């Protein structure tokens, strides 16, 4: 399954950090790419550094128009808008696991009505207000049934050695 993420909107300066965290979650939880508009280019640089160190081919693509992206993906990917409205994740997840390509859409603020209409699925993550970061993490984990948590990258220069107590990071050249 190929998973991509679109983050719509950016609010003031505080959102550079939130945007970075949304992208880090997308990467760590198995997405291959995140699309963003109106974002500080340093966010892309941060993610490139993370991928260089921890491995993987995660891409950050800066776009001019989220509407144009959604229209271009219509028919080639299942567009899944993560929201507090819509059908529950429990009701939708079974059919979504059978899809070949998913574009998960998360919003930074009030999401324009177009998103609800362009989405193939409006999926409720809990029916309560919370962050787009938590919605994305829950969705990607449920979609992949936790398999992404044990995924490794052969090109990683650092790897965490799981331990019950303490911490240990293996450093070296990629395999």
Curated annotation (Swiss-Prot):
* Single GO molecular function: tRNA (cytidine(56)-2'-O)-methyltransferase activity
Name the residues that bind S-adenosyl-L-methionine: 82
Q: Give yes or no: UniProt keyword S-adenosyl-L-methionine.
A: yes
Coiled-coil annotation: which residues? none
Task: Give any Gene Ontology cellular component.
Answer: cytoplasm
Function of the protein: Specifically catalyzes the AdoMet-dependent 2'-O-ribose methylation of cytidine at position 56 in tRNAs.
SUPFAM superfamilies, per this entry?
A: alpha/beta knot (SSF75217)
- State the InterPro entries in the record: Alpha/beta_knot_MTases (IPR029028), tRNA_m1G_MTases_N (IPR029026), tRNA_mtfrase_aTrm56 (IPR002845)
Q: What is the lineage of its organism?
A: Archaea, Nitrososphaerota, Candidatus Cenarchaeales, Candidatus Cenarchaeaceae, Candidatus Cenarchaeum
Q: Which HAMAP family match?
A: tRNA_methyltr_aTrm56
What keywords is this UniProt entry annotated with? Answer: Cytoplasm, Methyltransferase, S-adenosyl-L-methionine, Transferase, tRNA processing
Q: How does it assemble?
A: Homodimer.
What this protein catalyses is: cytidine(56) in tRNA + S-adenosyl-L-methionine = 2'-O-methylcytidine(56) in tRNA + S-adenosyl-L-homocysteine + H(+)
Q: What class of enzyme is it?
A: transferase
A GO BP term here is: tRNA nucleoside ribose methylation
Lineage: superkingdom: Archaea
Assigned EC number: 2.1.1.206
Q: A Pfam family matched by this chain, by name? A: Trm56
Q: Family assignment?
A: Belongs to the aTrm56 family.
Compartments it resides in: Cytoplasm
Name of the protein in its database record: tRNA (cytidine(56)-2'-O)-methyltransferase
For whether the record's keyword set contains S-adenosyl-L-methionine, the answer is yes
């Amino acid at each position: 399954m190929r998973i991509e993420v679109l983050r719509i909107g950016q609010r003031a300066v505080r959102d550079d950090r939130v945007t970075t965290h949304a992208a880090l979650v997308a990467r760590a939880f198995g997405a291959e790419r995140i699309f963003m508009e109106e974002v500080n280019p340093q966010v892309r640089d941060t993610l490139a550094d993370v991928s260089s160190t921890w491995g993987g081919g995660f891409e950050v693509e800066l776009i001019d128009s989220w509407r144009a992206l959604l229209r271009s993906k219509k028919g080639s990917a299942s567009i899944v808008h993560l929201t507090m409205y819509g059908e529950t994740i429990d009701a939708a997840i079974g059919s979504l696991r059978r899809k070949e390509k998913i574009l998960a859409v998360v919003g930074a603020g009030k999401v324009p009505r177009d998103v609800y209409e362009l989405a193939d699925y409006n999926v409720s993550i809990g029916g309560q207000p919370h962050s787009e970061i938590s919605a994305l993490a829950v969705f990607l984990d449920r979609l992949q049934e936790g398999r992404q948590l044990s995924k490794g990258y052969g090109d990683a220069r650092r790897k965490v050695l799981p331990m019950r107590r303490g911490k240990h990071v293996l450093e070296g050249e990629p395999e």
